[in-house]
Amino acid sequence: MLSQPSRERAFVLALGLVVSSSLAAAAPCDIYSSGGTPCVAAHSTTRALYSAYSGPLYQVKRGSDGATTNIAPRSAGGVANAAAQDTFCASMTCLITVIYDQSGRGNHLTQAPPGGFKGPEANGYDNLASAIGAPVTLNGQKAYGVFISPGTGYRNNAASGTAIGDAAEGMYAVLDGTHYNGGCCFDYGNAETSSLDTGNGHMEAIYFGTNTVWGSGSGSGPWIMADLENGLFSGSSPANNAGDPSVSYRFLTAAIKGGPNRWAIRGANAASGSLATYYSGARPNASGYNPMSKEGAIILGIGGDNSNGAQGTFYEGVMTSGYPSDATENAVQADIVAANYAVTSLTSGPALTVGSAISLRATTSCCTTRYLAHTGSTINTQVVSSASATTLKQQATWTVRTGLANSGCFSFESKDTPGSFIRHSNFALVLNGNDGTKQFKEDATFCPQAGLNGQGSSIRSWSFPTRYFRHYSNVLYAASNGGVHTFDAAGSFNDDVSWVISSGFA
């Protein structure tokens, strides 16, 4: 009989042969199944997680007419057909309405309902994610991830086959390690079926961010931790595990697994390298976590009680039945690396040149002589022409800068107030001085795309990609198509968010 180390080595070899034979033969859920811990939920908007899977990955909904379509892999086991989305959503806004479960259990993720906390949408539901907020490529093929802004969340409170009570499970997610905050809580995993906080140990989910209300790791974060309810844990201590490092890989693999009085945190660069173990040992030294009382719902982007103040980006993830071996997880990581996640352009339409001075003209039929300008800190539209006073020309001129939060997009500095930039604040656009904070940089970063009405450019917020520069009663907002605010009204939306960009007046 083989010893335990020998069995482990044999399993690694077997999985290695699967991985090396072909990418399609080594999809993550095939690997977990070979390891004896099959997927009970498999979610991805970027690719199939089974080699034979050819069903829908996700559904998108158009803002113009409410029509929906499903996006499937290009071929069985392959990358999502982003071109089908681009065609369906051309010159329109689109939201991700369903993230389908590929496991066959029907554990699909949909718009999260209200719970202990209400969401910002109608009837307390959370927002849905933009379909274009997180473009990437996998082996050179374009796909879209799920960009979670604060207030956005997905959930399934009636999941099938997920771990209940103290039963063992594993999970991983591929995330954007540069997109996070300190809000509660950017999670993926097992949560309460009531959307309420029902006590310690009633969750087991991957958390990623810089929240320090409960636990923390080394450095200043962000960290991979486990949300076990009423605590984000980095190890056995409720307070800190110095072995849990700050990690900010552009593509990050985060893994959590837990069983009776044991659990582990693992992480890696999803683009290269191997998983490292940040914690492996007993359950936290606090009441309610041994045994666990997991309930089996599935969440994405939110906490178990619908806490929805966090942000992050999700590309793929699964949940398993049983406690996966390190060898199984290592083989999954090898497959993730082989998928070759890479960044791609966040912008489209007429090109902008960093350092240039521009003016932006409205295209709505009422307002084609009006340009984006400011009066003090208020961003508005004003009638401007070559005959206008120099002061007004300067107020309607903006210097293009590299995006303060993401170099793939842009920030717009006031010509007449150097050091001040357009930002969104409570979804109004305002002119504020750059205070150098992470929050300011994110609020002041915008990504142009081809104009939704066929003219010029539409300029969406990087941090809230459902929201665009919109003039409404001559005042500027970061508006979504048909959202809950007055300035989100669907009427004339595509016209109101389309701007013709020209050389600056000043």
Curated annotation (Swiss-Prot):
Keywords per UniProt: Carbohydrate metabolism, Disulfide bond, Glycoprotein, Glycosidase, Hydrolase, Polysaccharide degradation, Secreted, Signal, Xylan degradation
Gene3D superfamilies according to UniProt: 2.60.120.200, 2.80.10.50
Signal sequence, start to end: 1-26
Record's keyword annotation contains Glycoprotein: yes
Residues annotated for substrate binding in this entry: D227, N230, G304, H424, N426, F427, D443, H471, L476, D496
Glycosylation sites: N285
UniProt free text on domains: Organized into two domains: an N-terminal catalytic domain and a C-terminal arabinose-binding domain (ABD).
Job description of the protein: Alpha-L-arabinofuranosidase involved in the degradation of arabinoxylan, a major component of plant hemicellulose. Able to hydrolyze 1,5-, 1,3- and 1,2-alpha-linkages not only in L-arabinofuranosyl oligosaccharides, but also in polysaccharides containing terminal non-reducing L-arabinofuranoses in side chains, like L-arabinan, arabinogalactan and arabinoxylan.
Name this polypeptide is given: Probable alpha-L-arabinofuranosidase B
Organism: Aspergillus clavatus (strain ATCC 1007 / CBS 513.65 / DSM 816 / NCTC 3887 / NRRL 1 / QM 1276 / 107)
